[in-house]
A protein has these predicted regions:
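Short, cationic-aromatic polyanion-contact patches
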Residues: 2-9, 23, 53-68
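Hydrophobic residues on short alpha-helical segments
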Residues: 11-17
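Glycine-centered, phosphate/nucleic-acid-interacting loop/turn motifs that mediate DNA/RNA or nucleotide
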Residues: 49
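A short acidic, leucine-rich amphipathic alpha-helix
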Residues: 26-30
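Flexible coil/turn residues that form the inter-helical turn or adjacent wing/linker of helix-turn-helix
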Residues: 20
Length: 68
């Protein structure tokens, strides 16, 4: 996978998702981000193959982004 420049917000989201599935609202509350900002970052992480939307408003970390 090519080197991707992740923002500090992206890294914080990925760290939370390493612990398990999360909603944007939960991530936003834990890090004092707006829910919209978290949704935007999650969408980018989905597009990059790091995160998968498993249900409406529920996301999880992709175990191996190379497999997406």
């Amino acid at each position: 996978m090519a080197e991707i420049d992740l923002s500090p917000t992206d890294r914080a989201i990925l760290e939370m998702l390493r612990e398990g599935r999360c909603t944007p609202a939960y991530i936003a509350a834990e890090h004092d981000y707006s829910r919209q900002h978290v949704r935007n970052r999650l969408q980018r992480l989905v597009e990059l193959g790091y995160v998968e939307r498993v249900h409406k408003g529920l996301y999880e970390l992709v175990q191996d982004p190379e497999q997406t």
